[in-house]
């Protein structure tokens, strides 16, 4: 039986943890006030980020989250995004994967949608 992937979602501004495993930023825009040198990232996978029109429409409005989730999952079926999603699956095969976002509410972010997809 295959091991269930250990996927975590955290804010990039939080202190890194030894349990984070591979740390991947999944936002399209680089986080304010953070230098690339102090980000403690494995990589920045902006190919899986929501499109700019979808991100602007959503605007982290909790009332729009379910519709955002539906639209974003549809975007993730596009070839370039699907390939990036598969890359994240590969990263999560053998060690924990922490998806990082700058949003103040990671539980209603693209990182949470990605984590749910990667866990299935």
Residue spans of the language-model regions?
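Residues lining hydrophobic/aromatic ligand-binding pockets adjacent to catalytic sites
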Residues: 1-120
């Amino acid at each position: 039986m295959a091991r269930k992937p250990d996927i975590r979602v955290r804010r990039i501004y939080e202190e890194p943890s030894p349990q984070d495993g591979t740390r991947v930023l999944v936002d399209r825009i680089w986080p304010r006030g953070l230098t690339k040198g102090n980000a403690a990232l494995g990589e920045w996978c902006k190919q899986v980020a929501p499109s700019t029109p979808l991100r602007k429409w959503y605007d982290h409005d909790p009332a729009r989250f379910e519709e955002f989730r539906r639209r974003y999952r549809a975007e993730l079926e596009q070839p370039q995004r699907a390939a990036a999603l598969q890359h994240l699956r590969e990263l999560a095969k053998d060690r924990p994967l922490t998806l990082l976002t700058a949003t103040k509410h990671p539980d209603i972010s693209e990182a949470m949608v990605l984590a749910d997809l990667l866990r299935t």
